Amino acid sequence: MANKQDLIAEVAAKTGLTKKDSEKAVNAFGEVVTEFLAKGEKVQLIGFGTFETRERAAREGRNPQTGEAIKIAATVVPAFKAGKALKDAVK
């Protein structure tokens, strides 16, 4: 499994940027995507995929320790849908 440092190193290797500059780029990408999603906007990268938010309905759950029924409130969660090129590359 690759982590953030692995991603930064690969970006540096592929672009010729320093690791410090690559880290800034990776961090900026994450921040920008987060800002768009927080405003309720989608981020579509053709061929790669789409970052979006989805509404999760309220539901009933259980406390695993007591078995007591609890209500879980509706919420908005981030989601990613892979694009065709990414799906094909992973096959």
Curated annotation (Swiss-Prot):
Highest taxon of source: Bacteria
DNA-binding listed as a keyword: yes
UniProt keyword list: DNA condensation, DNA-binding
Molecular function GO terms recorded: DNA binding; structural constituent of chromatin
UniProt xrefs under InterPro entries: Hist_DNA-bd (IPR000119), Histone-like_DNA-bd_CS (IPR020816), IHF-like_DNA-bd_dom_sf (IPR010992)
GO cellular component: cytosol
UniProt-listed GO biological process terms: chromosome condensation
CDD domains, per the entry: HU (cd13831)
Keyword Transcription regulation recorded: no
Homology family: Belongs to the bacterial histone-like protein family.
Function as written in the Swiss-Prot or TrEMBL entry: Histone-like DNA-binding protein which is capable of wrapping DNA to stabilize it, and thus to prevent its denaturation under extreme environmental conditions.
Quaternary context: Homodimer.
PANTHER family associated with the record: DNA-BINDING PROTEIN HU, DNA-BINDING PROTEIN HU-BETA
Name of the protein: DNA-binding protein HU
Protein source organism: Lactococcus lactis subsp. lactis (strain IL1403) (Streptococcus lactis)
Name of encoding gene: hup
